[in-house]
Amino acid sequence: MPAPTNAKGVFTICPTPFDDALKVDTESIKSLVDFLLDTGITGLAILGFLGELHKLNNAERRLVTDTFIQHTKGRVPVWVGVRAHGITGAIEQAQEAQDSGAAAVFAAPLDNASDALLFDYYKAVAGSVKIPVVIHDFPDSFGTEIRPEVVARLGKEGGVNMIKMEEPPVGQKISRIRDLAGDEAMKIFGGLGGMFFLEELQRGAVGTMTGFAYPEVLVEIYNRFAAGDHKGAAAVFDRYCPLIRYEFQPKIGLALRKYIYQQRGAIRSNAIRSPGMRIDALTIKELEATVARVGLSTTARGRQAVKA
């Protein structure tokens, strides 16, 4: 059964870098790790929906996992995504991640599963490993709703004590889960690109797991809020909201983020595998204008100054 965790803060969901021939680019994985650690994040989360896990074969999945974990060298925890069509496959992926040195796994639900099946699924995955298992609750992408009652039961009876919660209205669901489970049985991370990060913290979330490509902004919001400077956290959130909103666009969010990371020098190519929508020249122009409007740069290397 997984050990308890005190995880909190900003966990960046990482893209999987490919070269221009669409092969996994391990050198860009290493440079991305170094870049992200410089922004002050708490941890890395790999092979999530943003990481194009569903577009990798098994050998590539293991290569990506091993490269991220080995290059991170324990400087921050690395959480690994699990997504399978059945319990057996999910257990295999979770155990492989554990063997590679993952600090936790975050598991997508089974397709269109009942409450009973979801409970059995997550409990089985948790029972197969000694590292924490995180529920990935994103019904808009996975097509499966995980009700607060199921989440609470998993926290109390299933050995699963964390959730990446991405079902709007996020505030109401966070409060409902906390009411049913309590803060010790279920720790809640937000997501959805950081669009509701301030409200998630106000409702009791312990952090966020998202792929926003300026993670130093989220780190500043979290640090101010955790220090009791709630007005300062709100001021930072309000300043950068236009960029958070623009970057988290359905269908092109991955392409926008890979473009930003390439421009910032974190990865060598912004290539994405099919299926996946690319961005046109006008979209790039809009993005760069939005970045400039909030006082950031798409080309400056390394951590950028974040202001209220």
State where each predicted segment sits.
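Active-site beta->alpha loop and helix N-cap motifs at the rims of alpha/beta catalytic domains
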Residues: 3-145, 261
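Short, flexible micro-motifs
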Residues: 12, 46, 51-54, 84, ...
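General structural feature for long, well-ordered alpha-helical segments within catalytic domains
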Residues: 25-28, 32, 60, 64, ...
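Positions that flank functional sites
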Residues: 51, 86, 112-113, 140-141, ...
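Alpha-helical structural signal in soluble globular domains
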Residues: 63, 67-72, 96, 100, ...
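Secondary-structure boundary/capping signal
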Residues: 76-77, 133, 162, 185, ...
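Catalytic alpha/beta core domains of metabolic enzymes, predominantly
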Residues: 139-241, 245-249
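Structured C-terminal cap/extension of enzyme domains
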Residues: 199-308
